[in-house]
UniProtKB/Swiss-Prot annotation:
Entry's Gene Ontology BP terms: 3'-UTR-mediated mRNA stabilization; aerobic respiration; mitochondrial mRNA processing; regulation of mitochondrial transcription; regulation of mRNA stability; sporulation resulting in formation of a cellular spore; translational initiation
The PPR repeat ranges on this chain: 209-238, 251-282, 288-317, 323-353, 363-394, 401-439, 444-473, 481-514
Assembly mode: Monomer.
Cystines in this chain: none
Keyword set, alphabetical order: Membrane, Mitochondrion, Mitochondrion inner membrane, Phosphoprotein, Repeat, RNA-binding, Sporulation, Transit peptide
Protein's UniProt name: RNA-binding protein RMD9, mitochondrial
Family: Belongs to the RMD9 family.
Length: 646
């Protein structure tokens, strides 16, 4: 099924004048033209068939039959082959694991908690099958029957495992689950090493690969941020004597993937322009990934006329099974376009649900859009307007992590905008909280992000204000907020050791309540930031001030050197001010008192001598660390912690 012809005519009408519009800078005209684009066709959007996973064979019966015939041929094994048993075992391992992973692993992750994940039979079987497949790979790569399709399916499987593992590591980074993190990091190393071994074998001609496998291989390296490796592999493939592999890396879908990477490195439009002219003159529909790659390049190059022209062809010629490429390029117009009016027009089409295809608005795209607005215009009102639209659009339908990422970008810009105007900034902050609470229930990450970014104000009152809002909005606190509240004390002067110690004890009690057995690095880092980092900043300020005045600086900081900022209106507090020596002494005492509850002895080195490498002020106190008495530091009753013998 093609996109409707009458809808495509609207897009073509826009393309004719878009060049003049862009060149003349008539933003209003561009916006008006784009408003009539194919994407406004609501009738087609309501067609239920467009949202179903239509089997490939239904769309292209001839290609489907040919594919099944090809698969039967590549899986045939000569009964007399000495590799027969291993080949059949390999095929079974890969097939079973692929079947499991293409019913996304996310479904399994949702059904069972992270603590039980590694014990789940299906989950374990997936990783066992993958591990067994790699073992067989190292044996079978010498076999003449180990063809390009088998290698490609293995790469596909590794790519699936890579994506699921990366997703889990992102989720676990927000949770104190050391064992699960350790497992997934181990799997990540296994996957990276496996992909590297296969790519090395491909480049020396030991194994072959199809375009299907080449795409998964390069995409895997791209997702690992190994862009240079992608380019190295692709360039080397041109000179391979293995014709199957060499041609595979030159297939349109692979070239389409590589185009944005190559442009990012060379900034050359010679080849993209040549490919563009070939596509325009050709009557055949080339692989949509080539269109997608070219569109991304031309958006980056700010050649929007060509980008929109190709997008129009993709809309006209793409079949239902290609809708993912339409979505991908649509998001590129939002996140990568420097023409903010063009980007906002594509953004609004999603927000207003005017798409002829189902689309998920990726938060990374919105984040890029917000950053582009701020960088180009320095217009916070525009940023705020887009953020409001996005929050309303997401509402309560997305994972909290999605909004946490969006809010992190937004509040980074917010505090940059109000860095020297905390009075008006605080009023705006109250307005933001009121708006947000009217759209969805405020959760802990919202205030966590706000509190983290608010440290730039060095204002005690904002910390107290946000702290009270956790209670006001009945938000259950996780260990994350306890760490942030402790860490935030390192951004202000008007606190004292008693408060820092109280915050530390609250953190430890929360860890005990959660059943944690050890003090984690994240806990010690929060304590370090509240004490050592603050002390180092005071020392640096004093040295800088002395240099500016042309007077020698002393090596210690006194209370007279510390200036307490004026609190926000109507939010006064009377906390006393601690000095650098007091905070560092408290830091070292807490470290010493709680050392038995560290997971590893190397943590002591990391947060003493290791810490002093970044914060030299600590060196002045380490010589007396071994003789320091920490008996006056309390330790609450700990039921879950495991104390180590000293």
């Amino acid at each position: 099924m093609m996109l409707r012809r009458n809808a495509v005519r609207s897009l073509k009408t826009m393309e004719i004048s878009v060049s003049n519009v862009v060149n003349s800078g008539s933003i209003a005209m561009l916006r008006g033209k784009l408003a009539n684009v194919v994407l406004s066709d609501r009738t087609y959007h309501s067609s239920p068939i467009f949202h179903k996973n239509v089997p490939k064979g239904v769309l292209d019966k001839k290609n489907g039959r040919e594919q099944r015939k090809t698969e039967q041929n590549v899986f045939n094994v000569d009964p007399a082959s000495p590799w027969r048993h291993e080949l059949l075992s390999f095929d079974e391992c890969v097939s079973s694991a692929l079947k499991y992973s293409t019913t996304p692993l996310q479904n399994t992750y949702k059904r069972i908690g992270n603590n039980q994940l590694n014990k789940n039979p299906s989950f374990a079987m997936f990783w066992d099958s993958m591990g067994r497949a790699m073992e067989l790979y190292y044996s079978l790569r010498e076999s003449p029957d180990f063809n390009a399709y088998r290698v490609s399916r293995l790469i596909h499987l590794l790519h699936n495992g890579l994506r699921s593992t990366r997703d889990q590591l992102v989720k676990l980074s927000r949770k104190p689950d050391y064992d699960s993190q350790s497992f997934h990091k181990e799997m990540m190393n296994f996957l990276c090493n496996s992909l590297k071994d296969i790519s090395d074998d491909i480049l020396i001609g030991k194994v072959s690969v199809s375009g299907y496998g080449a795409t998964h291989l390069l995409t895997s390296f791209k997702e690992l941020s190994f862009d240079d490796d992608c380019i190295r592999i692709w360039e080397a493939s041109k000179n391979l004597s293995d014709e199957t592999t060499s041609q595979a890396f030159q297939e349109p879908k692979v070239v389409g993937f590589m185009l944005p990477l190559l442009y990012a490195k060379t900034r050359s439009l010679t080849e993209p322009n040549e490919l563009y002219n070939q596509i325009i003159q050709s009557k055949e529909f080339i692989h949509p990934n080539l269109y997608s790659g070219l569109i991304k390049v031309f958006i980056k190059a700010e050649d929007y006329e060509k980008a929109l022209s190709l997008f129009g062809q993709l809309c006209e010629k793409a079949e239902v099974r290609n809708y993912g490429y339409l979505i991908e390029t649509h998001l590129s117009f939002i996140g990568d376009s420097k023409n903010l009016t063009l980007a906002e027009s594509f953004f609004d089409k999603i927000i207003n649900d005017e798409m002829p295809y189902k689309i998920i608005l990726q938060v990374s795209t919105v984040n890029s859009f917000l950053q582009n607005i701020w960088k180009a215009q320095n217009d916070f009102d525009h940023v705020y307007r887009i953020w409001e639209k996005a929050v309303k659009f997401y509402g309560n339908t997305v994972n909290p992590g999605i909004l946490s990422s969006l809010n992190n970008t937004f509040f980074t810009i917010f505090f940059e905008n109000y860095i020297n105007d905390n009075i008006n900034g605080f009023r705006k902050l109250q307005e933001i909280i009121t708006f947000y609470s009217g759209v969805k229930k405020i959760d802990e990450p919202f205030f966590n992000v706000m509190l983290t970014r608010a440290s730039i104000w060095h204002e005690r009152s904002i910390i107290d204000f946000i702290d009270k809002n956790y209670t006001l909005y009945h938000i259950p606190r996780t260990i994350i907020s306890y760490r942030i509240l402790l860490k935030s004390l390192g951004s202000i002067d008007n606190t004292n050791n008693e408060e820092i110690l109280d915050r530390w004890l609250e953190l430890v009690k929360k860890l005990n309540e959660l059943g944690q057995q050890y003090i984690a690095n994240a806990d010690l880092s929060a304590l370090r930031d509240a004490t050592v980092v603050w002390s180092q900043s005071k020392r640096d300020e004093k040295v800088f001030s002395a240099k500016a005045k042309g007077t020698p600086a002393t090596t210690t900081t006194t209370e007279d050197d510390i200036k307490v900022p004026k609190p926000l209106e109507n939010l006064k507090n009377e906390d006393s001010t601690s000095n650098s020596e007091d905070r560092i002494e408290l830091y070292l005492k807490i470290l010493k008192r709680y050392t038995p509850y560290f997971r590893a002895t190397k943590q002591v080195y990391r947060y003493t001598t290791g810490c002093a490498e970044s914060y030299p002020i600590l060196n002045e106190y380490l010589s007396g660390y071994s003789d320091l008495s920490a008996e006056d530091i309390p330790v609450p009753q700990l039921h879950s912690f495991i104390a180590k013998e000293q």
